[in-house]
Structure formats: structure tokens, C-alpha cells
Amino acid sequence: MKLQNKWFIGAMLGAAVCLVSTSCVDEIKFGNSFLDKAPGGNATIDTVFNSAEYTRQFLNTCYSRQYYGLPYNTDSNGNIPDSSSPYLGKKDALTDCWSLYFSDATVYQQYYLGSLNANYGTRGNIFPYTREMVWEVVRWCWLLMENIDRVPGMDSTEKTQLVAEAKCLIAARYFDMFRHYGGLPLLYASFTGTESGYEIPRATVEETVNYMIKMLDDAINSGGLVWAYADADLASKAGHWTKAGAMALKCKIWQFAASPLFNDVNGYAGGNSEAEQQHLVWYGGYHAELWDNCLKACEAFFKELESQGGYSLNKASEETPEQYRQAYRMGYIRQNSKEVLHSVRTNMSDAFNSSSYMWHSWAVPSLCRTEYPPTQEYVEMFPWADGTPFDWKKTETEGKLDAMFLTGTFKNGEQLLSEIVLTRDPRLYEHCMVNGLPKMLDWSAGTMSGLPYELWVGGYDEGQNAALESGNYATGYKNMKYYLGTEYQRQYTHWVYLRLSDIYLTYAEALLQAKNDHRGAIDQMNIVRARVGLKKDLAECVTDKNLLSDKAALLEELLCERVRELGLEDSRYFDLVRYKRADRFEKRLHGLLAYRLDD
């Protein structure tokens, strides 16, 4: 085996909730033109808010334009966010952990080739300022809040709930944009279309953060949000904002705001640019209280979780690698998972061949437009099954490279391995298709079966992909996350916007940054690791560094743990951005070329 060198240059800087009404009221569809209705269009607004059912449908339209992190639709007419298009590409491919070989995508054309500039058009930026449906959703939510009191046939309890959900939607859409741009114009009402001007100044980072937090605090304290929906209500209510989701989003907002991108002694560009001088892209200095705010938000969330219950990490039914894989997989992929705090849907089930859900259908070998092969750097972040770090050179010296993914035995002249033992962190196999891994993990039982992936040069699956650096296996690996195998066909699809394991790791980061509490941070990380069988204390697994005293080392381990747990969920991209890690964006990356010994 040998490592394959390759260069990627990263630049640092949806989706409908399908709720079916059983009412005899006609469904009204709200397109973007609804925004253009001025006084002459007041009849449209009057029609909508003169019906409780139409008002609910209107809120569902707001939900349908949330951020969906998997490119699934090629609509270029502004009806869905640009980030939902395979022609834009996932931001994960700008990191050190995944690559993209679809040369027509913005990620490839503008970022990999280094041609990005401020004069971009449709899909010309990883998160276009005016083409992500952010401002549409914000205005629609304000319209609902301004008109909710006059809706007949809706009691005050439901009105309070809809307003609270609308405020969560505003906060979430602002956060989606904030992570890319910093300070934003702050809207406090809808426009009628008759105003003399629409010049709204860009707010500071601090003002934008306070705006989002106030929206969430209003929603949380209103009494309109349930903490968690009962199992019987999930079929119709899952995907709606809850109190748990709102409190978790507060943790994430404070985490981003407190990070060095915005909160440091020096601005990213040196501090002398106009945007920095006006505090549009940072706080203007380091403020320790921002990490305190993040810690308080995390403590409040977990205190409420202890009191209310309703959410938990999905646990393995048996202490085996297969069941640890199953526990991790079903924790994020299942719509009714107890660890999903907020999710977004775009359609129902998918058969992998639908033109309405291209995340699957465009990943086929003949297209490879939604395929994101993992890098060798990512694969090596996953430790051995006992939790000790994987080290290529050490493994090679010990002659154990053939066991770096799994071991097994050949019985009675059979050509397939039996008694397979997965030798690495079970999450590796849930993010990466690796050589020798059986192709099926039963949806219900979690048992492995089927032919193994042949990921060597000339192998059945890889063919010449890695040798030519093209196709699904261009790096010697294939993405597993959110794609899985044929067992995922015709299952319900969604994008997890917030999940519990992320908040455990956010809590760990807040403990480290706010209190320098190494032990407390490691304890939170251990909770996440234990779910997949890594039960040995992290500080005992990493023996070449003192994680109980070396803050930089523990922070680096935490960032690695985040991408092991939250791979292909945008986490790595934003983690590198908020810590200003140009070294990882510009790192020379690798794939794996493997050869059969008898070839």
C-alpha cells in the first residue's frame, strides 16, 4: 500500500417539512411572489390570515425553506436555497476530510481552482447572501407574527406556539448566515412594499448575536414550545421547533460567537480593515464572558434535559462493533431518533433513483456529482477499537497494515472472510466505505452481511478510480454518511440540524475554554465515545500528550472528536473556520492506493 498525494485548496473565508393536512380546506402554496404583494396584494394576506388552516400552511412554507445540508435539487429559479444544489457542492469538501471531483460544482470551480471573487452570480459562492432563502423566511415569519392575532378559529395557546416557532426559524436562518458573514442587517418587521427605502445598516457581530439570542429567549420563555414531542405526535410534529431545539441552538450560537474568528485579541485580517474597525466581523477584542455565556447555555440545556428527559444518545443493544455501528447510525438517520434535537425534511422516502432527491441518484458511478470521498487524513483520525490513536508509521513498523480496518479467517477454502472483527472506532465504518467491509448492515437487526468492498486498484468496486483520482472511490474510499447502502432505499430521509452528541461536545469545549476544566471536558467527550464502545478514559488512551494539563492538545483532540462524531454534518468546516485553521484548509491531502499481494 502507498499513500497517494493530492492537493486541495480550501477557502476560509430546504427543504420542506412535509406535513399532510387532513382538513377539507384547500391547500394554498406560497411562492416567492407572495413577498411582492404590496397594498394591492393585501387581499392575499387577508385570505391567508383569515383562516387557521391557511396560517398553519403558511408557517409550513417557512419551514420548507430551512437549510438542508445535503445537495438534493438543481432548481436555479430561487425557489430553494442554492446550497441545496449539487452544482454548488457541500462545504465539507473544502476541509481536510473530504474531497469533491465534480468539476462543474462551485466548490471545484471557484474554490479548488482559486477563481472566487466578489463578483459572483448564481451559485458562485458557498453560501450566497441573497440566494439562500434567508431573508424570505425572515420576512414571512414577521408577517405571521404581525397578523397572528387576527386569525379566527385558532386559540391563544396555538397562536403562542406558532409565534415561538417563527422566532426559532428567524434565529436559525440568521445563524445560518451569521456563520458565513458575521454581522447582518437586523429586521424587526415585514415590509409592505410601499416604503420609501430599504437601506438597513449592517449590525455588529455583538448586535447580531444578541438579536438571535433574544429571539430564542422569547420563544423559550413564551411557554409556547414543548420540550419534546411524545412518540404519538412525532408523525405530524417532528421537524417543528421545540424548547430543546431552541436551547441547543443557543449553545451553538454562543459557541460560534465565542470562538477566535470573532473573539480574539486580533482580527483575522489584522484589525485595520473597515469591517474590523466597525466590529462587523469580530467583537473588537477578546471577551472571556462569551465562553461563560456558552457554558451557561449548555448547563441550562443539560439541567432541563435531566429534569424533562425525552432525549438520549442511541445505545447499542449488544457490546459488539456491529451494534455500535447500528447505534451510531440510527442515532442520526432515523427520523424519530431520541438524539435528534431538530431536523429538516425535503421529501418522504427515497428509492435512490429519484430526480427530486439527487443526493442519492446523482451519486451513481455514471455521475458522481454528489460523491464526497473521504481523505486519508480523515481515516487516520479514527482510533483503534480500544480507543488508542491510530498511527500509520507505527502500524506499518509492526506489520499490521493488513489489519488496519478488520481481521477475519478463511474457512474450508472459502474466498470470503468469516468471523470478521472490526479493528477501529465503529464510527469509521459509518463514515467511510473501506476495503473488506461487508456491504450490508441490516436496517433493523444491525448485522453485517453481503460481499465485501473491494477497494484496491483493479478491485470490483474501486476499479481504476483511485489510480486515476476520479469516480466514487477517487481517494481509495467512498462516503458512507447519509448514503449508507441498499438498506437505506425507500427509508425516510432528513437532515439533522441539531443533535445531542454535538451539544455534549459543545459543553466539553465550553468547560475547557471558560473554566480551563480539562477533566470536565474529557468527561463529556467520554460520554460520546462510550456510545460506540470506546469506554476507556480518553486521557488514558492518548499517552503521548497530557490531556489533563495541555490545553492546546486537548482542544485539538476535541476538534478531532467532533469530526469523528459529526462527519459530513458541516461541523468540520465551521470548526476550522471559527478557529482560523488555515493550516488545515491548505494542508496537502492524501488518498490510499492499495494493491492485492498476488497482483
Question: Whereabouts are the PLM-identified features?
Answer:
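Bacterial N-terminal signal peptides that target proteins for export
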Residues: 2-11
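C-terminal motif of bacterial Sec signal peptides marking the signal peptidase cleavage site
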Residues: 20-23
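An aromatic- and glycine-enriched ligand-binding surface/loop that stacks and positions planar moieties
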Residues: 25-106, 184, 243-247, 252-458, ...
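Conserved, well-structured interaction surfaces
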Residues: 42-75, 99-181, 196-238, 402, ...
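Structural motif corresponding to the intra-repeat A-B loop/turn of tetratricopeptide repeats
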Residues: 177, 257, 514-515
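Active/binding-pocket-proximal capping segment
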Residues: 446-447, 482-483, 501-507, 517-544
